[in-house]
């Protein structure tokens, strides 16, 4: 009888522990970049850069840093494909522009080792997409001047500003 009492006690303890963790379980709700939002951002960024005669590539990533949309301008150089993606990934990962991140991770910074992470790049042109303080994605532009890349990326995000409120 002592053994079955211990077994019953153990079953009750395990069941109680499982029921409390089950009651704490929730569906996780997250905001993310929709396909239409990503397309709008990318198309706007390309159009903005074309006004200055620049042929660029644009990458938009979601909250997990996964590529959501990629557009390559008609005469954009092939290396800009990778650069646009890395700029977007950098802005998403660190929740700030790739230029701000580059400034924070200079050679004399205690954060300099972050530059060794795969897929990041210390070049201007990556801009986070935010809802309040939450980063839900990012856009990267490559093929203009570095300041031009960032301005075109910002124009893309500005186009969807009302949807980000």
Model-derived segments and their meaning:
Residues 1-5:
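N-terminal secretory signal peptides that target proteins for export/translocation
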Residues 8-19:
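Bacterial N-terminal signal peptides
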Residues 23-165:
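Flexible, solvent-exposed loop/hinge segments and secondary-structure transition points
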């Amino acid at each position: 009888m002592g053994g079955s009492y211990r077994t019953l006690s153990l079953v009750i303890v395990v069941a109680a522990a499982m029921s409390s963790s089950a009651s704490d379980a929730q569906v996780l709700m997250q905001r993310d970049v929709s396909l239409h939002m990503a397309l709008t951002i990318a198309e706007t960024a390309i159009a903005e850069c074309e006004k200055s005669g620049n042929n660029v590539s644009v990458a938009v990533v979601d909250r997990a840093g996964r590529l959501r949309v990629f557009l390559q301008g008609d005469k954009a150089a092939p290396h800009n494909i990778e650069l646009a993606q890395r700029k977007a990934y950098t802005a998403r990962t660190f929740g700030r522009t790739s230029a701000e991140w580059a400034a924070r991770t200079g050679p004399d910074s205690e954060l300099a080792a972050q530059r060794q992470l795969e897929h990041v790049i210390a070049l201007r042109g990556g801009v986070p997409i935010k809802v309040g303080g939450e980063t839900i994605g990012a856009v990267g532009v490559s093929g203009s001047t570095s300041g031009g890349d960032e301005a075109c990326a910002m124009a893309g995000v500005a186009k969807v500003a009302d949807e980000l409120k």
